[in-house]
Amino acid sequence: MKIKANKLQIEVEDTGGSGEVVVLIMGLGMQLVAWPVELVQALVQQGYRVIRHDNRDIGLSEKFDHLGTPNLFWESVKFRIGLSTKPPYTLHDMAQDTLGVLDTLGIQRAHIVGASMGGMIAQHVAIAAP
């Protein structure tokens, strides 16, 4: 389902009942469907409510095509030699998207799990809303 979160249209899958919430955040370029179905089912069978979402610019969530595609190699070179980089959005922005999803769904507490870059986003979520 699509929901409005952090002023964006975010694709969300909400599975399970009314137990404790587990948010699964996938990494760079990966959609929510990349989480193994067996993992989601096991969490639900243990009584958890599982929330997965496509990060901004990925899958069925809102795209930022108008910003163009950054050259990741060049951006990493600039970063390594101390030049400034201007990403179209940051990990903090993506963490705010996750918090927006939780707010829209009326969720105040959750366990946050991230894979790869999703783990970096999860750290920003924990910093912003311990």
List where the protein language model places each region:
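Methionine-biased hydrophobic packing positions in alpha-helices, especially
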Residues: M30, M94, M117-M120
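Active-site acidic short loop of glycosyltransferases
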Residues: A5, G17-G19, D103-R109
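Conserved acidic catalytic loop of the alpha/beta-hydrolase fold
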Residues: F79-A110
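Hydrophobic/aromatic ligand-binding patch that stacks against planar heteroaromatic rings
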Residues: A42, V101, H124-A128
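Conserved HGGG/HGGXW glycine-rich cap/lid loop of the alpha/beta-hydrolase fold
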Residues: N6-R80
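Conserved hydrolase catalytic core segment
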Residues: Q108-P130
